């Protein structure tokens, strides 16, 4: 797997090896996904991912990876949006969110931290 924020680099890599799995890393969810054949998946900052973005990417045969989620509410939103992968510093919490076994309620401090981002 090769990921990059430089789409031209991914195009060059695909020319050299069309079988390599590539991911385009972006801070925002851009339009024009139809023209991004050199990317097999999109890695997007979670705050810019919507359900419609995920549906559109999936309709093109592309996966969506969300980064970097560390709060339960954000993780649940990404699961609800249908992302294929989640990048986190708390994999145990992601597992619990996916399995629906969380026993943690977001604390006021964590909610405040989220609000001040």
Tell where the protein language model's regions lie, with residue ranges.
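Short loop-to-alpha-helix "cap/lid" segments that border enzyme active sites
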Residues: 1-117
